[in-house]
A protein has these predicted regions:
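Conserved acetyl-CoA binding element of GNAT-fold acetyltransferases
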Residues: 81-97
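A short beta-loop-alpha structural element at the N-terminal edge
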Residues: 5-19
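Conserved GNAT-fold acetyl-CoA-binding loop/helix
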Residues: 22-47
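C-terminal "cap" of GNAT-fold acetyltransferases
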Residues: 129-133, 141-142, 148-168
């Protein structure tokens, strides 16, 4: 039987989380999604270290092996603007190369839904680049509903699909 677990990331996880984020970045680039940067950009260990120290970053383990990561926040004014405290926001959902197709994405999002529910909030929210049709379809297959779009104000900025799903 396969064991899946989620725990809070620590400084000791930085190297493997950097690898996982870069694996996910490469997959996005392969689908012409440059929201995390173009080919060769990737994530540095310093960026991941800062993320781990400043946010709620989690490690997903499959049979004790780090296989995924994500961050969880209680607000996201950048993409969603000011909101009532009714949701939890997921960012950086990433699966390590070789671990795709094992249900880790849905496992992470179900875990987030349980956390949101435990905080007496109603929705799990996330965003993704609108032009990454495969990723948008994946989230929709998990029951997420696109409730809006957010265009970055920068010239040539991305347009983001804003998704939410009831946490119950």
């Amino acid at each position: 039987m396969t064991s899946k677990s989620i725990r809070r990331a620590t400084a000791e996880d930085v190297a493997v989380l950097t690898q996982i984020r870069n694996d996910a970045h490469a997959k996005k680039v392969a689908h012409s999604d440059y929201a995390w940067g173009k080919e060769g950009d990737g994530f540095s260990e310093q960026w991941v270290r800062n993320n781990v120290s400043q946010k709620e970053v989690y490690v997903v383990e499959l049979d004790g092996t780090p296989a995924g990561t994500f961050s969880f926040d209680l607000d996201d004014e950048r993409h969603w603007g000011p909101q009532e405290p009714i949701a939890g926001y997921v960012h950086g959902l990433s699966v390590r190369k070789g671990f795709n197709g094992r249900g880790l994405g849905s496992f992470m999002l179900d875990w987030c839904a349980n956390k949101v529910s435990g905080l007496n909030r109603r929705f799990v929210r996330l965003d993704c680049a609108v032009h990454n049709g495969k990723l948008c379809a994946y989230y929709e297959s998990l029951g997420f509903i696109r409730v809006g779009l957010w265009p970055e104000p920068e010239p040539d900025g991305y347009v983001w699909s804003l998704y939410e799903k009831a946490a119950d």
